[in-house]
Amino acid sequence: MILCDIGNSTAKFYNNGISKVMSIKEFQKFEPKDTVYFINVNPNFKRKLKGTLFFDLAPYFEINTLYSKELGVDRIAASCAINDGIVIDAGSAITVDMVNKNIHMGGFILPGITKYVEAYKSISSVLDVGLNSQVNLDKIPLNTRDAITYGVVNSVVLLVENIAKNRKIYITGGDGQFLSQFFKNAVYDKNLVFRSMLNVIKSKGL
């Protein structure tokens, strides 16, 4: 069974425990040979995904939410994967959602890590130094690379911890593993959205 999570910069595939990431440019040329069960937030693929071998799972997700109807299927899928806690999907954008006793309470959206880095680069080439995954958030930075990393990571961590309180934090997405190390009460699960998709397929008998 092939699953696909189509975002704004990549299309992530999952098949029998094996994950694969495809660029959006590659996905434009992709022609499936078997049925692909997908969720999609990229408006550029609406026509392509009407093909007979593409099966849209979005209509089959059921979520009890206080949020408006604008809630994207990516956030719905991530939120449906947990019963209680905070779920972070760190991709092109970083989505943060709160779930309390299976009720989606709301959430917020931040730029993705790459967007933060690009923003610094656009200000000055001097700030094009990348990030330090070993930065200590408990100490004031003493060099530019650490200063940028501190600003980027803490802008996410402090906002999340402000709403998380003592709730468990679940993190997924391309930058999820990087971010997870900066939270004390976090679980990183790269296949969290795919598990949610599999649950829908099983529960709906698809």
From Swiss-Prot:
Pathway(s) the chain acts in: Cofactor biosynthesis; coenzyme A biosynthesis; CoA from (R)-pantothenate: step 1/5
Location of the protein in the cell: Cytoplasm
Main location: cytoplasm
Binding site for substrate: Y67, G72, V73, D74, R75, T144
Cofactor section: NH4(+); K(+)
Note accompanying the cofactor annotation: A monovalent cation. Ammonium or potassium.
Gene Ontology terms: cellular component: cytoplasm
Single GO MF annotation: metal ion binding
Gene Ontology BP term (one): coenzyme A biosynthetic process
Catalyzed reactions: (R)-pantothenate + ATP = (R)-4'-phosphopantothenate + ADP + H(+)
Disulfide-linked positions: none
Family stated for the protein in its record: Belongs to the type III pantothenate kinase family.
Function: Catalyzes the phosphorylation of pantothenate (Pan), the first step in CoA biosynthesis.
Protein name, per record: Type III pantothenate kinase
Taxonomic path: Bacteria, Pseudomonadati, Campylobacterota, Epsilonproteobacteria, Campylobacterales
